[in-house]
Design a protein with these regions (language model features):
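C-terminal hydrophobic helical "lid"/dimerization subdomain
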Residues: 265-304
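Cysteine-cluster motifs in flexible loop/terminal segments that predominantly coordinate metals
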Residues: 86-146
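Glycine-rich beta-strand-centered segment in the early N-terminal region that forms part
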Residues: 21-35, 48-97, 102, 110, ...
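Short Gly/Pro-enriched turn/cap motifs at secondary-structure boundaries
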Residues: 19-20, 53-59, 128-133, 139-140
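Mid-domain Rossmann-like dinucleotide-binding core that forms the NAD(H)/NADP(H) cofactor-binding site
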Residues: 139, 146-148, 152-237, 241-242, ...
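A short acidic, Gly/Pro-enriched loop at the edge of an enzyme's catalytic core
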Residues: 242-252
Length: 304
């Protein structure tokens, strides 16, 4: 099999012929048809994010066709078309069985291994690590079976490849994490892949208004197509003032889909619900006023 391998942050990826071991229990082999290019991979490739084992095959969102299944896999068979998600869960640990699968003890997407901590890819007998359990920058990959979500065989796999990260993160933030009710107001800061899907999620639950905020006005046409009722160009207008002019009191839910601390600190919301996208937010939250969580009753939560 071939894969684009990152040997060292800051260096170009190199296409290599790798050995791929057979799937173990609860694992499947997927022939990759399409891969998304996530900003998380860029952060890893350029060294902005550190601590990853090398060499590594990047790619945390993709779609393909199941080629082989390991023991105990019941919901998949060869020939199935699947979306690959970077956040599979084991379904067996304490957190999974108590309804908190986002804390799954075996899910370690940035540690480079599968659920047992080992890899299935190797080069000259040395391990090559899997990014986000998926490693979609490869012609084939072994992934946890729960990472592969079956879809209709007539769905375009190039389109489906995007669902495993930005769509599930953005829509899931609205429906599952924040549980935005119909009629609630919401603002989305950052109208990229995840922000657009927050907007789409808001439209699905009939939130109103849905305010898109970005410094690039060229993104607003598509934001409106997905459900934004208003758009604020933050390069021209103060978004806090603009949002308060539109809502009188600020929004009920503010979704921060861009990793800029000043955006979070603007506090352009009413009741303090601030779900954060899947970026390292610890430093950002540390920069908030110390009384923000207590005095204002704020809730800072990652989207996925």
């Amino acid at each position: 099999m071939q894969a684009a391998v990152l040997f060292e942050p800051g260096k170009p990826l190199e296409v290599e012929d790798l050995d791929l071991a057979s799937p173990q229990e609860d694992e499947v082999v997927v022939g990759m048809v399409a891969s998304g290019v996530c900003h998380s991979c860029l952060h890893t490739a350029d060294g902005s994010w550190t601590g990853f084992p090398m060499p590594m095959v990047l790619g945390d969102e993709g779609a393909g066709v199941v080629e082989e299944v390991g023991a105990n896999v019941k919901h998949l068979k060869p020939g199935d078309h699947v979306i690959l998600s970077w956040s599979p869960t084991c379904g067996q640990c304490h957190y999974c069985v108590t309804g908190r699968s986002q804390l799954c003890e075996r899910t370690v997407p940035m540690m480079g291994g599968l659920f047992d901590g080992t890899t299935r890819m190797s080069l000259n007998g040395q391990p090559v690590y899997h990014y986000g359990h998926v490693a979609s920058y490869a012609s084939r990959s072994v992934v946890p079976a729960s990472c592969a979500i079956p879809i209709r065989n007539d769905m375009n796999l190039r389109t489906a490849a995007l669902i495993g990260c930005s769509v599930m993160t953005g829509v899931g933030a609205v429906l599952n994490t924040a549980q935005v009710p119909a009629g609630a107001s919401m603002a989305v800061f950052g109208v990229g892949g995840i922000g657009l899907n927050c907007i789409q999620g808001g439209a699905l639950v009939a939130a109103n208004p849905i305010i898109a905020v970005d410094v690039n006005k060229d993104k607003f046409e598509y934001a409106r197509q997905l459900g934004a009722t208003h758009c604020v160009d933050a390069s021209v207008d103060n978004p806090v003032e603009a949002i308060r002019d539109l809502t009188s009191r600020g929004v009920d839910y503010a979704f921060v889909a861009v990793g800029v601390a000043d955006v979070i600190k603007q506090k352009a919301f009413g009741d303090g619900n601030v779900p954060l996208r899947k970026i390292p937010v610890a430093k950002l939250v540390q920069e908030l006023p110390k009384d923000a969580s207590v005095g204002l009753g704020l809730s800072h939560r990652c989207l996925s």
